[in-house]
């Protein structure tokens, strides 16, 4: 039998359907409130509002659980590769060997970008931020695929594959242009993660040998950042897509949202904070500053909008960080890691942080890994965008396949 919640407004009672979730909290359907009760609901930041039904990602923030299509994120990070997870998010199931081989072949086939796109890069000054270049380049893809501006259902999968394939190429080109080096073309003999590292660090006169530990770490980072429910950038992609805008335009809006320091730029802020702390001896002083309401200092990398427990992605990255630094001979002498480990240990025992449920999040260790890999801080958010493009495309595809989909129009 259907369940209802009762809402009393000005003496009149309205029955609101309670929608049963397949997992997690049930939802009160308020879609008819404005029409029947002559008033709106108010929820700044959509803290308590579900904007859509989705079967892609599930989070239980109190228990520190993150699942994609029912699979635990830790299992995916340790047992899958990024394109296998991409297939899972887009199609809803893990691929067979044949499906996986076909999918990876298609991604490799579409990794090249049109040569004319090179001219777009020349319009930027050499000091341009790679995210600014990437934002423009991704949006410009609309001009190269005019036949896909009016999407049909058959185009969803091809568009997703094209986007997943071309984003790493554009990302690497953005980096190469920012440092004045020639663009490096994709190499289809390499897998997805190896290919990106190749395009980032090879030159026409020097080959780049991919370290398997580095490759494995980056693969995990990509998986851990692939999707995360209706966050700011994903919601932005869905809102843009709800108007019928093409996927290239939608993804560029997601990149713009991700660029914000409160969203995709947090791991860079963690690195800056660890540098500011400087040494383990200074940690108590900065802990005190974080507790002081009148002090503008914030302890970056702690706390999360959703998680009120240890971020499961952070747990994987902590061990990944140690593995990378051990491989590079930095495990015992990397000052940022030592400060991070001691800062975490102190904070997790402090009543101030325990009461507020402030635990390390995914950004706390990822920046240290990137720095050890030789990836500059201005590229951190770019790598986030590479990974999250998979989630954006899965969400974009799901939105278009939803019979209840409407153009987004907050009041």
UniProtKB/Swiss-Prot annotation:
<keyword id="KW-0808">Transferase</keyword>
<feature type="active site">
    <location>
        <position position="304"/>
    </location>
</feature>
<dbReference type="InterPro" id="IPR016142">
    <property type="entry name" value="Citrate_synth-like_lrg_a-sub"/>
</dbReference>
<dbReference type="InterPro" id="IPR002020">
    <property type="entry name" value="Citrate_synthase"/>
</dbReference>
<dbReference type="InterPro" id="IPR024176">
    <property type="entry name" value="Citrate_synthase_bac-typ"/>
</dbReference>
<keyword id="KW-0816">Tricarboxylic acid cycle</keyword>
<comment type="similarity">
    <text>Belongs to the citrate synthase family.</text>
</comment>
<dbReference type="Pfam" id="PF00285">
    <property type="entry name" value="Citrate_synt"/>
</dbReference>
<dbReference type="InterPro" id="IPR010953">
    <property type="entry name" value="Citrate_synthase_typ-I"/>
</dbReference>
<protein>
    <recommendedName>
        <fullName>Citrate synthase</fullName>
        <ecNumber>2.3.3.16</ecNumber>
    </recommendedName>
</protein>
<dbReference type="InterPro" id="IPR019810">
    <property type="entry name" value="Citrate_synthase_AS"/>
</dbReference>
<dbReference type="GO" id="GO:0004108">
    <property type="term" value="F:citrate (Si)-synthase activity"/>
</dbReference>
<feature type="active site">
    <location>
        <position position="363"/>
    </location>
</feature>
<dbReference type="GO" id="GO:0006099">
    <property type="term" value="P:tricarboxylic acid cycle"/>
</dbReference>
<comment type="pathway">
    <text>Carbohydrate metabolism; tricarboxylic acid cycle; isocitrate from oxaloacetate: step 1/2.</text>
</comment>
<dbReference type="GO" id="GO:0005737">
    <property type="term" value="C:cytoplasm"/>
</dbReference>
<dbReference type="InterPro" id="IPR036969">
    <property type="entry name" value="Citrate_synthase_sf"/>
</dbReference>
<dbReference type="InterPro" id="IPR016143">
    <property type="entry name" value="Citrate_synth-like_sm_a-sub"/>
</dbReference>
């Amino acid at each position: 039998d259907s369940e209802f919640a009762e809402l009393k407004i000005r003496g009149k009672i309205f029955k609101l359907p309670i929608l049963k979730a397949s997992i997690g909290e049930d939802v009160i359907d308020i879609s008819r409130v404005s029409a029947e009760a002559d008033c709106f609901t108010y929820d700044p930041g959509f803290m308590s509002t579900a904007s859509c039904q989705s079967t892609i990602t599930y989070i239980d923030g109190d228990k520190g659980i993150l699942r994609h299509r029912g699979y635990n994120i830790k299992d995916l990070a340790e047992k899958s590769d990024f394109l296998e997870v991409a297939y899972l998010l887009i199609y809803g199931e893990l691929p067979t060997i044949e499906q996986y081989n076909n999918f990876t072949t298609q991604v490799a086939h579409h990794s090249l970008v049109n040569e004319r796109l090179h001219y777009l890069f020349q319009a930027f000054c050499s000091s341009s931020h790679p995210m600014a270049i990437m934002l423009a380049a991704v949006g410009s893809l609309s001009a190269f695929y005019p036949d896909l501006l009016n999407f049909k259902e058959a185009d969803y999968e091809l568009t997703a594959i094209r986007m997943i394939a071309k984003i790493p190429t554009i990302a690497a080109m953005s980096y190469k242009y920012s440092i004045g080096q020639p663009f490096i073309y994709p190499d289809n003999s390499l897998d997805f993660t190896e290919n990106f590292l190749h395009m980032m660090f090879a030159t026409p006169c020097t080959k780049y040998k991919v370290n398997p530990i580095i490759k494995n770490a980056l693969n995990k980072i990509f998986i851990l950042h692939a999707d995360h429910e209706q966050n700011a950038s994903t919601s932005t992609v869905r809102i843009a897509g709800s108007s019928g805008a093409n996927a290239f335009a939608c993804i560029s809006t997601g990149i713009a949202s991700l660029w914000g320091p409160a969203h995709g730029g947090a791991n860079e802020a963690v690195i800056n904070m660890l540098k500011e702390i400087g040494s383990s001896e200074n940690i108590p002083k900065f802990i005190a500053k974080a507790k002081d309401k009148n002090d503008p200092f914030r302890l970056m990398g702690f706390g999360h909008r959703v998680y009120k427990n240890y971020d499961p992605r952070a747990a994987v990255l902590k061990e990944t960080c140690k593995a990378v630094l051990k491989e590079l001979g930095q495990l015992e002498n990397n000052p940022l890691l030592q400060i991070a480990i001691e800062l975490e240990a102190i904070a997790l025992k402090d009543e101030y942080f325990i009461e507020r449920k402030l635990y390390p999040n995914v950004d706390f260790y990822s920046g240290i890994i990137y720095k050890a890999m030789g990836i500059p801080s201005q590229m951190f958010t770019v790598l986030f965008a590479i990974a999250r493009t998979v989630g954006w495309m899965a969400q974009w595809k799901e939105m278009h396949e939803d019979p209840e989909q409407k153009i987004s129009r907050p009041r």
